[in-house]
């Protein structure tokens, strides 16, 4: 079933990877290394960022610099239309052996559907969270993939019941030990502040997320300074562009906090409490067994006119979804004053025993996921699944 100029060469295949965000770019880079372990002569092309390029991918476009969420993504329709049109022309004459879209369903489901129409195997990595919102898109997903590689334990059963070919590969966050030297806060240069009370701020990796969520985080920190003398805060940035954006907020609030890039795990381990944007970061924090407050600021009208009709899950925080209970406080959608955040943070910072109870529960929650990844990393499982699909052609 080889197409035009498609070699179907099992020893030197061509893989097309698509990552639209920083998190997907990191997953793509790790996956390239795993695929190269299976196919040393493989070629890699696709859509992604600097990390995929460094791993050896010929990057055709880098959308990670302006990635957006929900309604923000619609504003980029022209960009993606042009990119998809170019891919369609290229694949009509030179097809990759396997397409691997990574997360970002708004974009990647379109890429997957295009691949299936051209009879190119599609191995989708990181399942769209249709169990939480927009479950009616399951029909589109079912028609767009040959295999769906899920990263959360319950997803295999959910998507399997919907008729989607699914494998559970484990979550890539657990592929490396949490307490390795690279995540040790004492190893950072310059060192993090030595403060009696320590607050980590994780406002997200997208420009729109930071613009929405960092101001209430800053306001919460400023309010906590009056309750906890000597409190220090450190913000984690995905890259220098996001660090620059975060630092630009500080003069407006008269706040002095450190902003670090490439040190998120160490900052989490350093902190007593983490204020975080919703998303995968909550699982990253849980992996280190750290108490957290989770928020996502959204305009009132966006939630009431759009958001509440899309969301189907009882909880919005990934940690609470996995636990199926209110394990960590979540403030989503958040569109009011910061007093509830300040109250919740004060309660946890003033009561170490409450933080310790959360730490124990997070350890119990994440232990099975860590054990699964210890047996075989997620990237390697995805690589083996991609190889299986290719062998069927």
Question: Which sequence ranges carry the predicted segments?
Answer:
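Nucleotide-activated sugar donor-binding and catalytic core shared by glycosyltransferases
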Residues: 2-393
């Amino acid at each position: 079933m080889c197409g035009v100029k498609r070699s179907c060469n099992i020893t030197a295949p061509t893989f097309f990877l698509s990552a639209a965000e920083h998190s997907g770019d990191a997953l793509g880079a790790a996956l390239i290394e795993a695929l190269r372990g299976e196919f040393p002569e493989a070629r890699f092309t696709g859509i992604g960022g600097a990390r995929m390029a460094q791993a050896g991918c010929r990057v055709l476009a880098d959308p990670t610099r302006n990635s957006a969420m929900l309604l923000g993504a619609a504003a980029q329709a022209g960009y993606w239309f042009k990119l998809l049109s170019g891919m369609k022309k290229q694949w009509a004459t030179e097809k990759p052996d396997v397409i691997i879209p990574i997360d970002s369903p708004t974009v990647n489901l379109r890429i997957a559907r295009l691949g299936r129409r051209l009879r190119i195997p599609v191995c989708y990595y990181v399942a769209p969270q249709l169990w939480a919102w927009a479950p009616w898109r399951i029909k589109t997903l079912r028609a767009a993939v040959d295999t769906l590689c899920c990263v959360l334990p319950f997803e295999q059963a959910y998507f399997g019941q919907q008729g989607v070919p699914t494998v559970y590969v484990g979550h890539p966050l657990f592929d490396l030990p949490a307490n390795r030297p690279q995540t040790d806060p004492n190893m950072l240069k310059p060192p993090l502040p030595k403060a009696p009370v320590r607050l980590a701020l994780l406002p997200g990796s997208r420009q729109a997320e930071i613009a929405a969520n960092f101001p209430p985080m800053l306001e919460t920190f400023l309010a906590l300074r009056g309750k906890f003398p000597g409190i220090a805060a450190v913000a984690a940035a995905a890259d220098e562009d996001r660090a620059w954006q975060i630092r630009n907020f500080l003069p407006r609030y008269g706040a002095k906090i450190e902003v670090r890039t490439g040190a998120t795990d160490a900052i989490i381990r350093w902190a007593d409490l983490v204020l975080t944007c919703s998303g995968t970061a909550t699982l990253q924090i849980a992996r280190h067994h750290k108490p957290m407050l989770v928020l996502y600021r959204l305009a009132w009208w966006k939630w009431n006119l759009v958001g509440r009709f899309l969301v189907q899950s009882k909880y919005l925080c990934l940690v609470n979804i996995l636990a199926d209970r209110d394990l960590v406080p979540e403030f989503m959608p958040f569109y009011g004053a910061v007093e509830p955040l300040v109250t919740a943070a004060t309660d946890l910072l003033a009561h170490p025993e409450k933080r310790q109870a959360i730490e124990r529960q997070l350890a119990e929650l994440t232990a099975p996921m860590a054990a699964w990844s210890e047996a075989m990393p997620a990237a390697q499982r995805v690589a083996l699944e991609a190889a299986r699909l290719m062998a069927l052609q």
